[in-house]
Amino acid sequence: MASPAFHPLDCPDPAQVSFGTDGLRGHVGSAITSTLALQVGFWCGRVLPADGPVLIGMDSRTSGSMLVSALAAGLTAAGREVWTLGLCPTPAVPGLIRRFGAAGGLMVSASHNPPEDNGIKVFGADGSKLGSALQSRIEAGLRGEEPASAQAHAFGASHQRSDLLDLYKQDLLSSVRHQRLDGVPIVLDLCWGSATACGAAVFSELGADVTVLHGEADGERINVDCGSTHLEPLRRAVLERGAAMGFAFDGDADRMLAVDGRGRIVDGDHVLFLWGSALQDSGVLPDQRLVATVMSNLGFERAWQARGGQLDRTPVGDQHVHAAMVRSGAALGGEQSGHILSSAHGLSGDGVLTALQLASLCHGQGITLADWLDRSFEAYPQKLVNVRVPDRSRRKAWADCQSLTALVQEAERSMAGDGRVLVRASGTEPLLRVMVEAADPKAVEHWTQRLAEAADQHLNAA
């Protein structure tokens, strides 16, 4: 893959830089540049309130080293000590922040986006994604609205600390109490990304018979026709090898989707239902409560309520799930896309940890993932269509389009409470997402097509 043509010192208009649902993200050379990273690093160093080092991790993208260096330069210019972790899963960063009492951390990754994109996620001293107030201060600094007087103390220094990844691996093993998986045939799709740093190693350490797909760090192939957004290679490998289960990760390994031994997909809703049921049966699920987002399937919600459970819904984004779990004291939450958060394991979305939990729970009960999935809910037919809307203001203000909102209301009336419509602007890509689910699959197809066509017609009009 050829490198994109851009001037390395270009910087996007600061007025256009804002944190989305998962930090800053975009095409390297236009939305994300080394100059922007330098400034973001500096302002992170200024606004993070706690003392201590600032940790920086990265996925395998070829632009990652450039951006890590720029962030470290900005942070040290602001007087901060920096520890660079090298290639690691995103959840390693908040875990190590908490372990060492660090001031915060950054992850250079664009998650499931294509290789030519990159991004910056920022974490506070508690390991959670940075709150909106501090994000706003960083944005204000980029716009020149925060004072930038010289620090009274010396500049900081940067230290390479890739050795700390071993501590994260030990935390993963401890999360399942080192329970053995001797001889269990498991396929792992490591997506050419962050999961290559530890995914195969921890499963092999527990004795699993591991088959690895896309198992080297490759910044030009990360997420390309593999991983949690392209499950067919994993599904095919599980069936060909007669594996008990398979797990696919995204580029930075903070999410995971699974495939059972029959080739059926186990998405985040099923993970929540099955793991939540295990916690409920063990009497360790406070208020029988799970937290999910507006994208979670209606079949999941009704099946969980039939078990006597409560389901709280949040906007899309694991930071919203995190906030709701903290408020309610929920033990488990997540997203259909595979971000799963457990209060017993640090409240950070962690794909490798979730995969270990599923494998351990199944093996401990003497059942297969397919057996377990048979006990799960029947999902309502659901379809998601992405409509490309390059104009950000139109995308964000789609609800102001009366023709589109009227059509949404018509669709909801026609389903008479046995289905729903969700239209939302993506926080990470120039897309309007249109989702319809209903008991009647014909209604799903009909309304998805009509709504997507209407969105394209009205929001992309000249």
Swiss-Prot record:
Q: Which CDD domains match?
A: GlmM
The catalysed reaction is: alpha-D-glucosamine 1-phosphate = D-glucosamine 6-phosphate
Q: State if Phosphoprotein is listed as a keyword.
A: yes
UniProt entry keywords in alphabetical sequence = Isomerase, Magnesium, Metal-binding, Phosphoprotein
Question: Alphabetically, which GO biological process terms does the record hold?
Answer: carbohydrate metabolic process; peptidoglycan biosynthetic process; UDP-N-acetylglucosamine biosynthetic process
InterPro entries registered for this protein in UniProt:
A-D-PHexomutase_a/b/a-I, A-D-PHexomutase_a/b/a-I/II/III, A-D-PHexomutase_a/b/a-II, A-D-PHexomutase_a/b/a-III, A-D-PHexomutase_C, A-D-PHexomutase_C_sf, A-D-PHexomutase_CS, Alpha-D-phosphohexomutase_SF
Entry cofactor note text? Binds 1 Mg(2+) ion per subunit.
Summarize what the UniProt record says about post-translational modification.
Activated by phosphorylation.
MF terms in GO: magnesium ion binding; phosphoglucosamine mutase activity; phosphomannomutase activity
**What are the required cofactors?**
Mg(2+)
Q: Which residues bind Mg(2+)?
A: S111, D250, D252, D254
Q: Keyword Transport: yes or no?
A: no
**List of residues that carry Phosphoserine:** S111
Which Pfam family is one of this chain's hits? PGM_PMM_IV
Known EC number(s)?
A: 5.4.2.10
Q: Which GO terms describe its cellular component?
A: cytosol
Q: What are the positions of the active site?
A: S111 (phosphoserine intermediate)
Q: Which PROSITE patterns match?
A: PGM_PMM
Q: Which NCBIfam families match?
A: glmM (TIGR01455)
Q: Which family does it belong to?
A: Belongs to the phosphohexose mutase family.
Q: Which PANTHER family match?
A: PHOSPHOGLUCOMUTASE (ALPHA-D-GLUCOSE-1,6-BISPHOSPHATE-DEPENDENT) (PTHR42946:SF1), PHOSPHOHEXOSE MUTASE (PTHR42946)
Q: What does this protein do?
A: Catalyzes the conversion of glucosamine-6-phosphate to glucosamine-1-phosphate.
In Swiss-Prot or TrEMBL terms, this protein is called: Phosphoglucosamine mutase
Q: Which organism does this record belong to?
A: Synechococcus sp. (strain WH7803)
